């Protein structure tokens, strides 16, 4: 029989994230975004106190960069101090963004904070606050340097002779998530076999529970930082019962939420219809999350004659400027809750044409559309790769472009082909251009800073 207790599991705080592309934004919007990671940390501290947790575990990447800003370090120390004043211990590890060898303030950690080293998984005992009883063994290992490519999971082991609940802190990529760098790679099988009761993971910013016996948990980051980090962000509060089973409750911590919303132009004939649909969607978002600032990217899909306006007259860029002007005024009035900042319009729509007829045509456009259709099938991926490689070969002669293009995913290349097909339809219909209206943020070909893990 175990002694019941409660702890909070968070990871990937990325304090003082720099948010690439901020220079283009109004100062009032920019400053709120820059403050968002600190605000999420503040909400984490309040949650730990309100939920009366026995301790907090943080699974790496406290700071966004190894040479963490002075502000980031001081704000984190302040947060630790606040937890200490409430008698809440903290157990933490450092990850690939904030390794132990990063140049930071040499500050003695308070007595209630345990930082695990980088040589081998260490052990610490956690106690229940109300009576001081030992309730758990916490084990963890930090990144000594930024790049840890060894499987450190297999170096973990239960503390000999202890029957307490065992928690492991690990910052790494379980089962090779291709969206993130493969630091400290391991498999679920590796983790299950080490005999721990709860794996408190960090590194992957998307929240997920990979396994339940034992629990293998990514809480995700506490504050989204790009349209690649959409939806609620926060942490888990975990209740461990007498029978050793754990119950997890997710708590939102973010103050700025990112989302991608799809808007179909099917059947739209006039610009006014499209503008009304966009404005209505923005008000729906505002109504759904009145306590948050939302950053939204619109994916314009479907087919309709309004595509002609989006492609030829730059209607998307014009509306984007107006929407951003309105929300900038709200920001200047400090009306951040309910503010909906439109980040951009990804124009993926097309003209209202008979695509099936075009696919049957013995023409250049028909051939291109058939190629785009083939690209959707797995069997033709190799052929598709050859065609795209040939098309971009001249660009590969430039060293900087070669570096950027080498990091473009297969899915992005498919998007290029789809876009080329629609552009072909557009141009052959007498139009002069189509594309994407962006508003200050951009998905850089090298992945940008937003979704770094």
Language-model features: where?
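His/Asp/Glu-rich metal-coordinating catalytic cores
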Residues: 20, 26, 55, 66-217, ...
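Short coil/turn segments at beta-strand junctions that form active-site/ligand-binding loops
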Residues: 3, 54, 88, 164, ...
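Surface-exposed alpha-helical segments enriched in charged/polar residues
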Residues: 46-49, 81, 189-192, 283, ...
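N-terminal active-site segment of His-dependent metallophosphoesterases
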Residues: 1-73, 410
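Conserved residues at the C-terminal ends of beta-strands
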Residues: 59, 202, 301
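Domain-start "cap" segments at the beginnings of catalytic or binding domains
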Residues: 2-29, 233, 239-264
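Short amphipathic alpha-helices and their capping/turn segments at secondary-structure boundaries
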Residues: 1-9, 40-50, 126-129, 153-159, ...
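Accessory, non-catalytic peripheral segments of nucleic-acid enzymes
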Residues: 253-453
């Amino acid at each position: 029989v175990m002694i019941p207790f409660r702890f909070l599991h968070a990871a990937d705080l990325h304090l003082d994230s720099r948010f690439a592309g901020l220079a283009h934004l109004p100062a009032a919007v920019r400053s709120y975004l820059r403050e968002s990671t600190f605000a999420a940390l503040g909400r984490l501290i309040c949650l730990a106190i309100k939920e009366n947790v026995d301790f907090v575990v943080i699974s790496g990447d406290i700071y966004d960069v190894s040479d963490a800003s002075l502000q980031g370090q001081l704000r984190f120390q302040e947060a630790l101090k606040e937890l200490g004043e409430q008698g809440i211990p903290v157990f933490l590890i450092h990850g690939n963004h904030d390794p132990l060898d990063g140049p930071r303030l040499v500050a003695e950690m308070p007595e209630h904070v345990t930082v695990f080293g980088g040589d081998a998984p260490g052990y610490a005992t956690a106690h229940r606050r109300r009576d001081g009883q030992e309730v758990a063994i916490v084990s963890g290992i930090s990144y000594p340097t930024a790049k840890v490519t060894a499987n450190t999971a297999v170096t973990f082991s239960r503390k000999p002779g202890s029957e307490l609940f065992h928690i492991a802190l690990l910052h790494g990529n379980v089962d090779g998530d291709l969206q993130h760098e493969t630091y400290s790679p391991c498999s679920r099988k590796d983790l299950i076999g080490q005999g721990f009761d709860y794996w408190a993971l960090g590194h992957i910013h998307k929240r997920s529970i990979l396994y339940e016996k034992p629990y293998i948990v990514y809480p995700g980051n506490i504050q989204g930082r790009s349209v690649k980090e959409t939806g609620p962000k926060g942490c888990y509060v975990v209740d461990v019962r007498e029978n050793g089973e754990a119950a997890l409750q997710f708590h939102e911590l973010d103050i700025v939420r990112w989302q991608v919303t799809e808007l179909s132009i099917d059947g739209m004939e006039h610009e006014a219809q499209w503008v009304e649909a966009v404005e209505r969607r923005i008000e729906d978002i505002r109504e759904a999350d009145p306590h948050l600032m939302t950053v939204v990217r619109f994916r314009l899909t479907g087919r309709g004659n309004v595509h002609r306006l989006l492609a030829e007259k730059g209607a998307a860029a014009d509306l984007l400027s107006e929407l951003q002007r309105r929300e900038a005024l709200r920001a200047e009035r400090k009306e951040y809750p309910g503010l909906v900042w439109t980040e951009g319009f990804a124009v993926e729509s097309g003209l209202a044409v008979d695509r099936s007829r075009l696919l049957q045509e013995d023409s250049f456009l028909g051939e291109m559309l058939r190629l785009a259709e083939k690209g959707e099938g797995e069997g033709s991926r190799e052929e598709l790769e050859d065609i795209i490689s040939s098309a971009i070969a001249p660009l590969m002669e430039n060293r900087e472009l070669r570096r950027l293009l080498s990091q473009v995913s297969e899915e992005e290349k498919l998007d290029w082909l789809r876009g080329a097909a629609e552009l072909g339809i557009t141009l052959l219909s007498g139009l002069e251009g189509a594309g994407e209206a962006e508003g200050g943020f951009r998905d850089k070909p090298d992945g940008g800073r937003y979704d770094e893990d």
